[in-house]
């Protein structure tokens, strides 16, 4: 499994919104500038996040985006599942309507299922709040006189 650029950028966008949650609605151009991501690329990610009601949006002069919930209520796993379509390490574990024809006899299937559980448990155990705290700690450690 390889996390796509879309997934990584969505996570950076959500973390940026968490960082600036006290600023009200945040313009996409500001997120793009701070994160050094193309605004056009972020415009492709926003509909995916918006449809899932994890963002609040408003239009107009003071328009922009903000988190719909508190940062501790979002997991990295949730965000990546929305943008990646799943976290399965192999195609046969993806949520396809047609199961793998070798499913009943595959000796490696239990291993892949175990890996998927480990990945999901790990990513579901990290919240945006956790990432915010790590970011703050890193910034404090980077302080130079």
Residues of each region from the PLM?
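Beta-hairpin "wing" of winged helix-turn-helix
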Residues: 54-67
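Short amphipathic alpha-helical interface segments
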Residues: 10-22
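Key DNA-contact positions within bacterial/archaeal DNA-binding proteins
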Residues: 40
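Basic amphipathic alpha-helical segments that dock to polyanions
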Residues: 45-50
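A short alpha-helical element within helix-turn-helix/winged-helix DNA-binding domains
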Residues: 26-35
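C-terminal regulatory/oligomerization modules of transcriptional regulators
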Residues: 76, 94-145
């Amino acid at each position: 499994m390889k996390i796509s650029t879309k997934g990584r950028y969505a996570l950076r966008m959500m973390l940026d919104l968490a960082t600036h949650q006290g600023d009200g609605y945040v313009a996409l151009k500001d997120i793009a500038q701070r994160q050094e991501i193309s605004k056009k690329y972020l415009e492709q990610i926003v509909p995916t996040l918006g449809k899932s009601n994890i963002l609040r949006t408003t239009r107009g002069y003071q328009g922009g985006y903000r988190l719909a919930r508190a940062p501790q209520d979002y997991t990295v796993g949730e965000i990546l599942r929305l943008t990646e379509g799943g976290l399965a390490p192999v195609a046969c574990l993806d949520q396809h309507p047609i199961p793998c024809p070798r499913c009943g006899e595959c000796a490696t299937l239990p291993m892949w299922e175990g890996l998927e559980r480990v990945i999901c448990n790990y990513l579901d155990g990290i919240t945006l709040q956790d990432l915010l705290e790590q970011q703050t700690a890193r910034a404090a450690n980077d302080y130079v006189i």
